[in-house]
C-alpha cells in the first residue's frame, strides 16, 4: 500500500518536488532542488527524501507531444535509475506532457504576482503526482 509519495519534475537546471498522499489523492508543492547540467544537488534531495520518507517516488518522463522520446528523456531515465538505487524506493515514470503548461495556467488562475520558475517547477511536480494518483 502506498503511504506518502514524492513526485519529481526533472530538469537540467532545477528539479521540482511535490509530496502527496494516496488516501486523499492530494499533492502539495515542496519546492525545487538546483541541478547543474542535469545533476541534482544530491545533498538537498537526500534531505527531502529523508524528511518525507516516501514509499514511492514518481518521476515525470519528458516526451514530446506525440509521446516520442526527446534528448532529455534519456537523462530523466538515468536520473530515475539513480534515484531508485540511491533511495531504495519504488520509482514510477509517468508522461509529464503539459505539466509545466498546466502549472503556469494554475498560477495565472490564482493571479500569482510572481510566476517564478521555482513555483512552476514545484507545481509541475504536483500535476505529475495528481495525474499518477488518478491513474493508480
Curated annotation (Swiss-Prot):
Keyword Lyase: no
Main subcellular location: cytoplasm
One GO term (biological process): rRNA 5'-end processing
Keyword set, alphabetical order: Cytoplasm, Hydrolase, Nuclease, Ribosome biogenesis
Gene Ontology MF term list: nuclease activity
Enzyme class (EC, first level): hydrolase
A cellular component annotation (GO) from this entry: cytosol
Documented EC number(s): 3.1.-.-
Localisation per UniProt entry: Cytoplasm
Function: Could be a nuclease involved in processing of the 5'-end of pre-16S rRNA.
Membership in a protein family: Belongs to the YqgF nuclease family.
Name of protein: Putative pre-16S rRNA nuclease
Organism this protein belongs to: Francisella tularensis subsp. novicida (strain U112)
Amino acid at each position: 500500500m502506498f503511504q506518502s509519495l514524492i513526485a519529481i519534475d526533472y530538469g537540467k537546471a532545477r528539479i521540482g518536488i511535490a509530496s502527496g498522499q494516496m488516501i486523499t489523492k492530494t499533492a502539495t508543492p515542496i519546492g525545487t532542488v538546483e541541478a547543474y547540467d542535469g545533476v541534482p544537488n544530491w545533498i538537498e534531495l537526500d534531505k527531502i527524501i529523508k524528511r518525507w520518507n516516501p514509499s514511492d517516488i514518481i518521476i515525470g518522463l519528458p516526451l514530446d507531444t506525440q509521446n516520442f522520446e526527446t534528448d532529455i528523456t534519456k537523462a530523466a531515465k538515468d536520473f530515475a535509475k539513480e534515484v531508485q538505487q540511491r533511495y531504495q524506493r519504488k520509482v514510477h515514470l509517468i508522461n509529464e506532457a503539459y505539466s509545466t503548461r498546466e502549472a503556469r495556467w494554475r498560477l495565472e488562475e490564482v493571479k500569482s504576482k510572481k510566476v517564478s520558475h521555482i513555483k512552476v517547477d514545484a507545481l509541475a511536480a504536483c500535476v505529475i503526482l495528481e495525474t499518477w494518483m488518478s491513474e493508480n
